[in-house]
Amino acid sequence: MSEIRTQVQFVDIDEDMAGQRIDNFLRNQLKDIPKSMIYRIVRKGEVRVNKKRIKAEYKLKAGDLVRIPPVTVEKKEEDVAPSTKLNKVAELEHMIIYEDDHMLILNKPSGTAVHGGSGLKFGAIEALRALRPQARFLELVHRIDRDTSGILLVAKKRSALRHLQAQFREKTVKKFYFALVMGQWKSSCKVVNAPLLKNEVNSIVRVNPNGKPSETRFKILEKFEQATLIQASPITGRTHQIRVHTQYTGHPIAWDDRYGDRRFDAYTGQLGLDRLFLHAANIKFQHPSNDEWMEINAPMESKLEKVLVGLRKAN
């Protein structure tokens, strides 16, 4: 068993920290401390704001002075990150394709979840926090599927998080994905409007008239003998949206373990593919500090490029 000890901290709340609940603030400040311990020290009155006891739902205001007490907690050895996990964290440093004082943008590798949960203790956001232990604030702006690679926005300030998430809600952010799909995509199929319903038991998403309105726009990038490379732009942001909409048209994405086609997977597997061929390649949005439009491109990993080379040769 190892032990984690923190020192007493006094934090002056500025405009950027204001507006968040004290429990969420403490979870950011005490990253290695279990949630149960955080709620306990709040409940016992050990956390003080302006020298007064507060409840977990208290929302911080600019000018507040927060006292965070010293905390000691035992850490089980199996919870300590092994060397393989540390190597993955180090590798992620090289996947950061843009960074400034307000945000960073990651070219997330396929197979990495955006956050821990559902049996996963470590995700991209946890890895970034491990890389930047001094960072006061690191939060996901949006999410992409674990098996999807590509652009992932992370806010470094609460004001940036609010600004960027507002753009996602207002649908002013333009996102473009590259996907390799089975068969010959029809040039006439430029938009798929099909409501999506998620099964809460197995998380499978299907087109269903009772589902949420969902729209994806498509463009053909390159045609092959048995496949098509397409660009997909989701107008709405439903779970598995691009994957289900392509399946719905009869052209599932290569190596999609939920919605794919085994014969097509076997064919592309012979070309070296062993992961979902879906990549968040391009994004356009307004910078949170000055509203200037930005465009970011994330290159595909060499494995996907090699598959395309193999398909061209097969033609």
Swiss-Prot record:
It catalyses: uridine(955/2504/2580) in 23S rRNA = pseudouridine(955/2504/2580) in 23S rRNA. The active site is at D145. Transmembrane segments: none annotated. InterPro entries: PsdUridine_synth_cat_dom_sf, PsdUridine_synth_RluA-like_CS, PsdUridine_synth_RluC/D, PsdUridine_synth_RsuA/RluA, RluA_PseudoU_synthase, S4_RNA-bd, S4_RNA-bd_sf. Its EC number is 5.4.99.24. It comes from the Bacteria. One of its GO terms (molecular function) is RNA binding. It is an enzyme of class 5 (isomerase). The keyword Nucleus does not apply. Keywords: Isomerase, RNA-binding, rRNA processing. Residues 20-93 form the S4 RNA-binding domain. GO terms for biological process: enzyme-directed rRNA pseudouridine synthesis. PANTHER family: MITOCHONDRIAL RNA PSEUDOURIDINE SYNTHASE, RIBOSOMAL LARGE SUBUNIT PSEUDOURIDINE SYNTHASE C. Responsible for synthesis of pseudouridine from uracil at positions 955, 2504 and 2580 in 23S ribosomal RNA. Belongs to the pseudouridine synthase RluA family. This is Ribosomal large subunit pseudouridine synthase C. It comes from Vibrio parahaemolyticus serotype O3:K6 (strain RIMD 2210633). The gene is rluC.
